[in-house]
Structure formats: C-alpha cells, structure tokens
Regions:
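Flavin-dependent oxidoreductase catalytic cores
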Residues: 1-181
Length: 181
C-alpha cells in the first residue's frame, strides 16, 4: 500500500456496517468510518443506534459519523460517542442528500448556512475539549454545495476549520446531483 495517499473508506448509510468495515480493513483500507448515526438517537440512548455506532478493535482506526443540525445536541452526542464508543475521530455529516435527512435540515442541508456549520463544529469542539477529549479529531464530510447555484464548499470548509475541524472531505457533487455519475 502506498501510504502517500491513505485509502479511506467513505461512510455510506446502509453499506458501511461492521461486516463491511472488517472486509475493507482486511483488503487494505487505512481508515474506516461508521454508517452515519443520528445525534438525537445517540442522546436518547437508542439501542439500534448503539449497534451502528459500536467500533471494535479490528476496525481501528475508525471514525464515527454523526448527523444532525442542532449544535447543542451535536455537542452532547459527540461527548457521549467519545465516552461510549471510543472512536478514533468523530466525523460530521454535511453531505447526505437523502430527502428524509435534508428535509429535517440535516446532512447536506447544513451547507445552506455556513454559520450553522461553524456553530455545530465549534460547539462540538468545545464540548469534546471540556469533556476531556481534546485529542479527539473532529472531521467533516460535505458536498461541493447544495445545488449548482450554491457551490460553497470552500466557504463552509473554512468555517468548519475556524470552528475546530481537523479535516474536511468533499464529495465532488452537489446535493442536487445526488449520486449521479
């Protein structure tokens, strides 16, 4: 494996479950990411969410991906996840294009407001730092923009960096493009 550019498994709801992550690790993935999990469900202690979020020793390094759009809930969920699931990083989903996610203001809908993106990351960073997890990397997965009239990945990425994100990954399509080739 050429480690100049690490092979990182992209988080995909309904795909990157524990069995798939183990298979990818076996075949050379350098870094894994869980399926996205709801910050609200984490805060409510949902059992199905706990199963999705569980990371075992054979999956390391592995990030846990959270989605949500309420800064306080995202912050609380980040600390719960750091304590309960001990991920190697926490990734924030600002890229999911699914209508049921976007219609709630989550996923790629967050990109409509760079200020909200900043607030989410800043609150999460503060909560992690205050909870004893200052060494926990906070990363973001986003799209190039919400639609072709709003290509704002650079602006949102800079706001996330200002808020405390250590890394940003850009899916080179807009929400409008969904998964089109």
């Amino acid at each position: 494996m050429n480690n100049t550019f690490p092979l990182i498994l992209a988080p995909m709801a309904g795909v990157t479950d524990k069995a798939f992550r183990h298979m990818c690790k076996k075949h050379g993935a350098d870094r894994l990411v869980t399926e996205m999990v709801s910050a609200k469900a984490v805060c409510f202690g949902d059992e199905k969410t706990a199963i999705l979020a569980h990371i075992d020793s054979g999956e390391r390094p592995c990030s846990l991906q959270l989605f949500g759009s309420e800064p306080d809930i995202m912050a609380k969920a980040a600390v719960i996840c750091a304590e309960k699931f001990t991920p190697d990083a926490i990734d924030v989903n600002m890229g999911c294009p699914a209508p049921k996610i976007v219609n709630n203001g989550d996923g790629s809908a967050v990109m409509k407001s760079p200020e909200l993106a900043y607030e989410i990351i800043a609150r999460m960073r503060d909560a992690l730092d205050g909870g004893g997890f200052s060494d926990m990397p906070l990363t973001v997965k986003m799209r190039s923009g919400f639609d072709s009239a709003h290509i704002n990945a650079v602006e949102v990425a800079l706001m996330c960096e200002k808020g405390g994100a250590a890394e940003v990954t850009v899916h080179g399509r807009t929400r409008e493009q969904m998964y089109a080739p």
